Every structure is written in C-alpha cells, then in structure tokens.
Amino acid sequence: MMQELKILNEKRAEIYWWLSSLFFKELSEQDIARYHSAEVRTFLSGLADEQSLNREVKHLVEALNRLQDRQDAQLELAADFCDLFLKSDRDSALPYASVYADQGLLNGKPAQQMRELLSAHGVKVEQNLNEPEDHLAIQLDFLAHLAISANQIEHSAQLSLALQAQSDFISQHLLTWLPAFAERCTQFDAFGLYSAAARLALAFIQQDKHCLDELIQETH
C-alpha cells in the first residue's frame, strides 16, 4: 500500500502544481502552445477518466480549442487574466481567501494563517510572486508540498496524521472560499478558460478530500 500511496501522492502533487500554475500568472505563447500539444491533451484525457472531473475537463478542453481560433490569443487571454484576477472592482474574481472570508479585505486573517503554515513547514513563496500568502496559487502549491512530503513518512500512524493535515487544510483553507471564487469566475469570464479552470480546481479538490478521508480510514 505504501508504494501505491507514494505514486498517488506524486500524481496529486503534479495536478496541484499544474492548477497552481494556471492562477500564478498569465500564460505565455509557449504555455499556450504546450496546451495544444499531445502531451498535455493526454494528461487532460487522463483527468477526464475520473467521472467527477469529466464535465469540467471537457469545458476546459473546449475553451482551449476555441483559443486556437481566437485572434491575438495570448494577449486576449492575458487580458482575461488581468480583468478577473488583478482588478479590484466588482466585476472580478480575486484569487485571495481573505476577500471571501474577511469582509472583502485583502491580507486578512486567512493570509496570516497561511503565513504561519508556510513558516511551520519551511515553505518559501517564490520571490517573483509578490502576493499575499492566501493567493490560490500559493495554497495549491502548498498542498502539493504536503502531498510530496508525506512520501517521506514510513510509519502508518504518522502517515495518517499527514493525510489528515491535508484533508483539514482543504476543509479549512480552500473549501471555505473556492466555491464562491469559482462562481465569480463563471459569472465574469466571458471566454471561459479561467472559469473552466476554477471549476475543475474545485471539483478536483472536493474529490481529493474524499479520497484522503478514505485513505485515513484505511491507515487507522
């Protein structure tokens, strides 16, 4: 079981790092070209094999296909990113937990809690990401770190605690605000790529928590 769990954690971390990259910064021309490659399309097809993710992966692939026909695709997609995630007006979907959990204020209690968690686990935020620690990209990256770190554990009791910590993080730091974030993305993202990514992130996180909770029961 331990070897199977290590493989699973590596796959989970890969998906979390990928999701984090979508909300980290605008996609470059090279990034967009990769999304049209056989390698990435195979990766997405693999995700779609999971029934709970199938619909959201389909929406993301449809948006990527539309992107091939979009004039000035990179510039237009960068504008979508800016309008959704970088503007502080009512027609945006800011990717910070504090906005949804702390009277709409930036850098609130969720950011402080994330700072404490990152420090406790010795995780440093990338220097070029000048954002509060409750940014979605940072939270997803941290979850990937927790998944990979669990692979260093050999004893089942400690492993159960590590899995519980991941489940608790999802409950306390992501599912508290991600549904509202995904809803706002859907409301304000006319083209639909980032709203599809947000809904896929939410679906994967919900499914991952269910999987973690089952694993916790098995390791007891």
UniProtKB/Swiss-Prot annotation:
BP GO annotations: protein complex oligomerization; protein folding
Listed SUPFAM superfamilies: TorD-like (SSF89155)
Cellular compartment(s): Cytoplasm
Top-level taxon of the source organism: Bacteria
Keyword ATP-binding attributed: no
Any one GO CC term of the record: cytoplasm
Pfam families xref list: Nitrate_red_del
Keywords annotated in UniProt: Chaperone, Cytoplasm
PANTHER family the record matches: CHAPERONE PROTEIN TORD, CHAPERONE PROTEIN YCDY
Function as written in the Swiss-Prot or TrEMBL entry: Involved in the biogenesis of TorA. Acts on TorA before the insertion of the molybdenum cofactor and, as a result, probably favors a conformation of the apoenzyme that is competent for acquiring the cofactor.
Family affiliation: Belongs to the TorD/DmsD family. TorD subfamily.
HAMAP family registered for this protein in UniProt: TorD (MF_01150)
The name this protein goes by in its record: Chaperone protein TorD
Taxon lineage: Bacteria, Pseudomonadati, Pseudomonadota, Gammaproteobacteria, Vibrionales
